[in-house]
């Protein structure tokens, strides 16, 4: 799937009980090579009752998955714009990929912009397996205090991604039991820029910075 625009659709996915890995919208690049030009905009994604436990698969409003055991795979040109996301559990906009740098083939030209995220208890925007992603002009607020005591989460953060720019965002009211910062440059991420953002009323404060996980460097 490439050269596609998903525009102006309202999605909900609420079952009787919570279901691990439940999503509103999933984009999958797996053993598919390079997919180009995917736009997700003007959507309302709400009421996705996934698992509240990350290790169980969690749940997301928008999930971008990139894996390639046989063929290196990625998305080149992904825009997530002007969406309203609320009451999606565990997460809002979530990328997943391999963290193995021996097979590094990152998503490129990723823009996450002008999204409103409300009443999401876990991670707001997670950039994983990308190079040069821009996350800007997003508002994340009113994170409900419903995560289990074991769960860590934060507002906007890259994981195993390089040269991420996080700017002109507002994150407020994060209430996770662990972390709960507005912003984070997480594990195995190089060249992250966090600038001109607003953070307030988050249990963990403004920002968290992690190293490569195996050293103090």
PLM feature segments, named:
Residues 2-13, 34-49, 72-91, 105-123, ...:
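Right-handed parallel beta-helix
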Residues 18-31, 53-72, 87-104, 119-127, ...:
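Extracellular beta-strand/beta-solenoid scaffold signature
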